[in-house]
């Protein structure tokens, strides 16, 4: 749509650039949402394996359910922190539900749930498994550490899990914090 008459005085027609830029906080919001979704993928994959481990044990001991596959794996009993970590799907659900309308309060709930259901159980597991790790490191042949399929020590598997899970939870909290900062209203002095 063109205007009638001559061009406005003092412009050469190149003053549209300021209207074509997207505000920085919108760019950051889209970027952090995308990154968080990518962190939720490995978190959910690990969560599925943990649900299988803990769920099979729960069904076996409480309902007498038997499955040849899980019996062949010869997994040790689940620790209490594993049951709490299985609730770490809650921050994923909260964060994803906050994305559509940029609900800051729901994102804050997801942030704190990430700590309570994700990092806190992992830290308890780290501390609880430390004596077992030290025992295994000092005497690999004579230690009584539970094994996976009778071969590989579970304490090593747990510490690999802790390394991966703590990074996923830590980076998720980091990006949730920055996403909340992008969504927060600007404070005027």
Swiss-Prot record:
Any Pfam family matching the protein: Jagunal
Residues in compartment: Cytoplasmic: 1-34, 97-105, 172-189
Keywords: Endoplasmic reticulum, Membrane, Transmembrane, Transmembrane helix
Main location: endoplasmic reticulum
Topology relative to the membrane: Multi-pass membrane protein
Side Lumenal, residues: 56-75, 127-150
GO cellular component, one term: endoplasmic reticulum membrane
Species of the source: Caenorhabditis briggsae
Subcellular location: Endoplasmic reticulum membrane
Official protein name in the record: Protein jagunal homolog
Family (UniProt): Belongs to the jagunal family.
Membrane spanning stretches: 35-55, 76-96, 106-126, 151-171
GO-annotated biological processes: endoplasmic reticulum organization; vesicle-mediated transport
Record's signal peptide: none
